[in-house]
From Swiss-Prot:
Enzyme Commission no: 5.4.2.7
Protein name: Phosphopentomutase
Binding site for Mn(2+) 2: D287, H292, H340
Catalytic activity: 2-deoxy-alpha-D-ribose 1-phosphate = 2-deoxy-D-ribose 5-phosphate; alpha-D-ribose 1-phosphate = D-ribose 5-phosphate
Annotated source species: Syntrophotalea carbinolica (strain DSM 2380 / NBRC 103641 / GraBd1) (Pelobacter carbinolicus)
Encoding gene per record: deoB
Subcellular location: Cytoplasm
GO biological processes: 2-deoxyribose 1-phosphate catabolic process; 5-phosphoribose 1-diphosphate biosynthetic process; metabolic compound salvage; nucleotide metabolic process
GO cellular component, one term: cytosol
Cofactor binding: number and manner: Binds 2 manganese ions.
NCBIfam families given in the database record: deoB, PRK05362.1
UniProt key word Nucleotide-binding: no
Length: 392
């Protein structure tokens, strides 16, 4: 297949679906983490026939998933070169932007100068200002929030400033405006994301976060593959929280999603809407609903639901289309703690035109995905090593 024939690429990020600790995992406290294999083991095996045919079982041993003799996709693993294990860092590297300096994190709470700035915008000082699980902090502070109207601020070991507010106390629009204000404040502190966390409910027993979550990311500190594709006249559609992660930069149009099912549906719609360009999708439920909440069984069900959808989605592809399935970090629900884990990520690359699968080995950077897409469309490779020659 010649270079000019490639027309559409779909890049799907299974948020949090790592496949084993990186060599430096112990430096992040993540020795022994291996999200996908551990989820499969905890579930007593997974039924992933479509991913199995593509070659998933040849990347790492996964209970219930065979290492087929003749996989239909290129397969391998990618290591993260950037410092960190957060969503923004992982996605930026997938788009060709490697960070030498990690985002700042505040696991012991934010300093007074940041909280003072928040109070100036909100009109009140926040509750919380601690590192906590999103569901647990609602149990702890949700009722006080209802009584006082003070927003809840919390963080984690990742570079996030999260603001939770009940939808009857603060409208989503007001919460988003507050987050936008804090985004401007926090750029100079290198906080990766400000996250709006609206919730509903009447007591600690039934408080529940809604699908109104919004991420306000620090803008990428340089151009990415997305900018290059746009500048070359191609369409870049961001499904799920992709546009938020890139602060809208390089995104032709955003298709927000409420959950994995909606994200998968919109990915299929997006592919039908473009003739030349990229559909970049994030499916967040693996991480948000199951990894952080230590729900391995729910994680496994979500993977099986994705696999069932994927089988039908592949029928939409033309010979000139390419599919890349990967992840941005790990989020192992079987290890202590509720945070992300520093892991390698799976790499599956498929097209109807691909004659047979091959082993891509262990790639040295997530940016190899961006390098390959750039190579397919005859764009400059900013960083990473293209594996386009393996597609010909």
């Amino acid at each position: 297949m010649t270079l000019r024939k490639w027309q559409r690429v779909v890049l799907i990020v299974l948020d949090g679906v790592g496949v084993g600790g990186q060599p430096d995992a112990s430096a992040y406290g993540d020795q022994g983490a291996s999200t996908l294999p551990h989820v499969a083991e905890r579930c007593g095996g997974l039924k992933l026939p479509t991913l199995e045919k593509l070659g998933l079982g040849r990347i790492v041993p996964i209970a219930g998933v065979d290492a087929v003799a003749e996989p239909s996709a290129l397969y391998g693993r990618m290591l993260e070169r950037s410092k960190g294990k957060d969503t923004t860092t992982g996605h930026w590297e997938l788009a060709g932007l490697v960070q030498g300096e990690p985002f700042a994190s505040y696991p012991k709470g934010f300093p007074d100068e940041i909280i003072d700035a928040f109070a100036g915008l909100a009109g009140v000082r926040p509750l919380g200002n601690i590192a906590a699980s999103g569901t647990e902090i609602l149990k702890q502070l949700g009722m006080e929030h209802l009584q006082t109207g003070r927003p809840i601020v919390y963080t984690s070991v990742d570079s996030v400033f999260q603001i939770a507010a009940h939808e009857e106390v603060m409208s989503c629009e007001a919460l988003y405006a507050l987050c936008e204000g804090m985004r401007k404040v926090l750029d100079r502190y290198r906080v990766g994301r400000v996250i709006a966390r609206p919730f509903v409910g009447t007591s600690a027993e039934n408080f529940e976060r809604t699908s109104g979550r919004r991420d306000f990311a620090m803008p990428p500190q340089g151009d990415t593959l997305l900018n290059d594709m746009q500048n070359a006249g191609m369409t870049v559609l961001g499904v799920g929280k992709i546009s938020d992660i890139f602060a809208g930069q390089g995104i032709s149009r955003a298709l927000k999603s409420t959950d994995n099912a909606d994200g998968m549906r919109k990915t299929r719609e997006a592919l039908a809407q473009i003739e030349r360009g990229l559909v970049f999708t994030n499916l967040v439920d693996f991480d948000m609903l199951y990894g952080h909440r230590l729900d391995a069984l729910g994680f496994g069900r979500a993977l099986e639901e994705f696999d069932a959808w994927l089988g039908g989605f592949l029928a939409d592809f033309r010979d000139s289309d390419l599919l890349i399935i990967t992840a941005d970090h790990g989020c192992d629900p079987t290890t202590p703690g509720t945070d992300h884990t520093r892991e390698s990520v799976p790499l599956l690359v498929w097209s109807p035109a691909l004659v047979c699968g091959q082993d891509l080995g262990v790639r040295e950077s997530f940016s190899d995905a961006a390098a390959t897409i750039a190579d397919l469309f005859d764009l400059e490779i900013r960083t990473g090593q293209s594996f386009m020659d393996r597609l010909l």
